[in-house]
Amino acid sequence: IGVAVECKDGYLMGSDGCKLDCLMKKGTYCADECSRVKGKDGYCYLWLACYCYNMPDSVKVWERATNRCGKGK
């Protein structure tokens, strides 16, 4: 019997609710950050924000519908 594990992909989110920026960061920054949250891999999308693959469902990612970036806390 196989066990299905759901994983998610998405933009990492900083404590301010914004996408985690990768502009002017070292080349492995996003892969390192994705690994830190137990994602399989990640990259700097258009040199602007970290996008990660296969993260645990518990990791909060940026979503347009719940965006609070720049809106205060």
UniProtKB/Swiss-Prot annotation:
GO biological process, one term: defense response
Top-rank taxon, per record: Eukaryota
Expression sites by tissue: Expressed by the venom gland.
All copies of domain LCN-type CS-alpha/beta, residue ranges: 8-70
Alphabetized InterPro entries for the sequence: LCN-type_CS_alpha_beta_dom (IPR044062), Scorpion_toxin-like (IPR003614), Scorpion_toxin-like_sf (IPR036574), Scorpion_toxinL (IPR018218), Scorpion_toxinL/defensin (IPR002061)
Entry's localization field: Secreted
Disulfide bonds: 18-69, 22-44, 30-50, 34-52
PROSITE patterns on file: LCN_CSAB (PS51863)
Disulfide bond recorded as keyword: yes
Molecular function, one GO term: sodium channel inhibitor activity
Signal peptide range in chain numbering: 1-7
SUPFAM superfamilies named in the record: Scorpion toxin-like
Annotated GO CC locations: extracellular region
Domain remark from Swiss-Prot or TrEMBL: Has the structural arrangement of an alpha-helix connected to antiparallel beta-sheets by disulfide bonds (CS-alpha/beta).
Other notes: Negative results: does not affect the cardiac Nav1.5/SCN5A, the peripheral nerve channel Nav1.7/SCN9A, and the voltage-dependent potassium channel Kv1.5/KCNA5.
Reported function: Beta toxins bind voltage-independently at site-4 of sodium channels (Nav) and shift the voltage of activation toward more negative potentials thereby affecting sodium channel activation and promoting spontaneous and repetitive firing.
Family according to the record: Belongs to the long (4 C-C) scorpion toxin superfamily. Sodium channel inhibitor family. Beta subfamily.
Official protein name in the record: Toxin Td11
Source organism of the structure: Tityus discrepans
